[in-house]
């Protein structure tokens, strides 16, 4: 068999692919290659997914088909090993009370009487970083996955690299602030760690360049010429009408970062891609392949025009948008003729062991502490790297302003609403409670509760604002019900099925009619049936009377059996739990 070795990898692509695929099969995962893209020469991307659980999927990119597949499989192990596929979901009562929730080496810290942070979690540096004003309480740090307040705070062990000491970091903090940043899997420990550290640099320097509107030096043509595959990819993009800028993002040779920007003159927009790796050529190739990962050439019209409003560019919400899908704003200043830094023909390359040491030296020089959690329970090395102040995707204040577990106490109540028979006043009190707790009207209820609902029911599109319409109907407050119904039609209609949209049109009409004291409703019944259909009129009438206000929502028990999508997620997680238990019992 042919052996293909590429820079930065400690095994042949063929060996990695065969090993990863066999391990996934052994673990019981049924993976398929769902789609491939090869929009320009030397740029491939692939989407792989679990046939049994649609929520488990990854994308891979590379200069060849094999490199892209190895990339996707590596990312799959990264997300399985770190439990990232399950980061947004409640795992149910059984797992919450099982021997372990995340890993057998997790540690639980009971909540204290005064709700202060318990002794033993975090170190002094982390406490100062996450809780400078002493506003953080223990109950804020219950993890979404278990939601088990009786058990306390679940914290995971990370190794502090400066002294190899174990530090316990709450899963709640990891999930809320770092999401997928700094996660990696690889053929060897050093290969994966280099990738994870490179990603931290890539995202941090990207944010700095964008936020500070730094103008970067272009990579000279003679340097680009060393990488003919990249040159051919760029030439094809330019021939298709997309001007390309290739920049040195190292900020004077300090960081292993490249930036490539694509212009789309057809609609006046631009898109900046960043990549990082100790090897200049690897970083450049990654940046170009990232530019088109999961995109064909006709998908390059969804970005934003450059702007002179540098304040808006620097806003945290804009940087978050860049992290999610790179569609945020870019300043025109990035493209100034006179760069803020000189071009440096940098190289931090060596063996993966040397590269890890080199990257760690950069963090040390900046007095940045690095925390690493290693995972080998699936037979593939993976890690999660945290560098507070550099690898955070969201600010520490999100722990109390936008914590992913802030709706956990509502889960049982909201899931029981369909079929409930409360006093009318109690439904209206729940609206008041949602307001008092500061839940955004646009928040999807399934995300607030950590549920995989599937797309075939009303829970999938339900937002807090629509829920308020239902609660107002149940509480008999028709004025409030009309206001929230109209909110729902304005802000949620685009994601509704035709049937649900028609129901809300009918409901709005009946609510408006209810305000007309001098009109007799029966006079309009025939016209309403002709306009909206008998089913919609019947459903809207039942909502108006308070009999059936929760249209399209089925009652859900604590086992979540009503949601097959959530069950498939739990089945996938159970496979991982078995592998963890077996590995840690050795």
What spans do the regions from the language model cover?
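Helix-biased "structured C-terminal domain" signature
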Residues: 1-586
């Amino acid at each position: 068999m042919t052996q293909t070795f590429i820079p930065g990898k400690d095994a042949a692509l063929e060996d990695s692919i065969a090993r990863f695929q066999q391990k996934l099969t052994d673990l019981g995962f049924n993976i398929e290659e769902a789609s491939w893209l090869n929009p320009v020469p030397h740029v491939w991307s692939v989407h792989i997914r679990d046939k049994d659980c649609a929520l488990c999927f990854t994308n891979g990119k590379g200069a060849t088909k094999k490199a892209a597949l190895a990339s996707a499989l590596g990312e799959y192990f990264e997300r399985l090993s770190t439990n990232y596929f399950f980061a947004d979901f409640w795992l149910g009562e059984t797992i919450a009370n099982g021997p372990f929730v995340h890993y057998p080496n997790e540690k639980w810290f009971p909540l204290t009487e005064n709700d202060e942070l318990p002794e033993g979690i975090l170190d002094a540096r982390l406490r100062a970083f996450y809780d400078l004003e002493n506003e953080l309480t223990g109950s804020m740090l219950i993890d979404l996955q278990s939601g088990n307040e009786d058990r306390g705070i679940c914290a995971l062990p990370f190794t502090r690299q400066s002294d190899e000491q174990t530090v316990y970091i709450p899963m709640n903090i990891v999930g809320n602030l770092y999401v997928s940043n700094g996660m990696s899997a690889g053929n060897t420990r050093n290969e994966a760690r280099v990738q994870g550290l490179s990603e931290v640099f890539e995202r941090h320097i990207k944010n700095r360049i964008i936020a500070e509107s730094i103008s970067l030096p272009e990579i000279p043509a003679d340097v680009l010429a060393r990488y003919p595959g990249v040159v051919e990819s760029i030439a094809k993009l330019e021939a298709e009408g997309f001007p390309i800028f290739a920049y040195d993002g190292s900020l004077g040779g300090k960081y292993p970062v490249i930036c490539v920007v694509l212009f789309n003159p057809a609609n006046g927009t631009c898109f900046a891609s960043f990549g990082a790796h100790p090897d200049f050529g690897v970083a450049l190739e990654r940046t170009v392949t990232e530019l088109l990962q999961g995109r064909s050439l006709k998908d390059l019209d969804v970005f934003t025009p450059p702007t002179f409003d540098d304040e808006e560019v620097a806003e945290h919400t804009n940087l978050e948008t860049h992290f999610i899908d790179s569609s945020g704003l870019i300043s025109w200043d990035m493209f100034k003729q006179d760069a803020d830094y000189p071009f440096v023909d940098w190289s931090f390359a060596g063996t993966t062991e040397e590269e890890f040491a080199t990257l760690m030296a950069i963090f040390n020089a900046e007095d940045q502490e690095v925390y690493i959690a290693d995972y080998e329970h699936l037979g593939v090395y993976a890690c999660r790297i945290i560098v507070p102040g550099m690898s955070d995707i969201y600010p520490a204040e999100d722990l109390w302003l936008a914590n992913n577990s802030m709706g956990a106490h509502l889960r049982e109540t909201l899931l029981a609403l369909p079929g409930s028979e409360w006093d009318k006043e109690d439904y209206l009190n729940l609206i008041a409670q949602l307001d008092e707790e500061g839940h955004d009207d646009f928040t999807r209820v399934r995300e607030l509760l950590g549920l995989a609902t599937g797309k075939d029911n009303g829970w999938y599109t339900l937002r807090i604002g629509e829920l308020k319409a239902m609660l107002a109907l149940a509480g008999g407050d028709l004025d409030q019900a009309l206001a929230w119904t109209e909110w729902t039609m304005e802000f949620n209609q685009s994601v509704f099925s035709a049937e649900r949209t028609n129901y809300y049109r009918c409901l709005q009409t009946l609510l408006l009619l209810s305000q007309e004291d001098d009109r007799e409703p029966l006079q309009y019944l025939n016209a309403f049936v002709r306009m909206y259909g008998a089913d919609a009129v019947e459903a809207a009438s039942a909502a108006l009377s308070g009999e059936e206000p929760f249209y399209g929502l089925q009652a859900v028990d604590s086992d979540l059996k009503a949601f097959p999508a959530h069950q498939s997620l739990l089945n996938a997680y159970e496979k991982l739990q078995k592998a963890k238990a077996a590995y840690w019992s050795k």
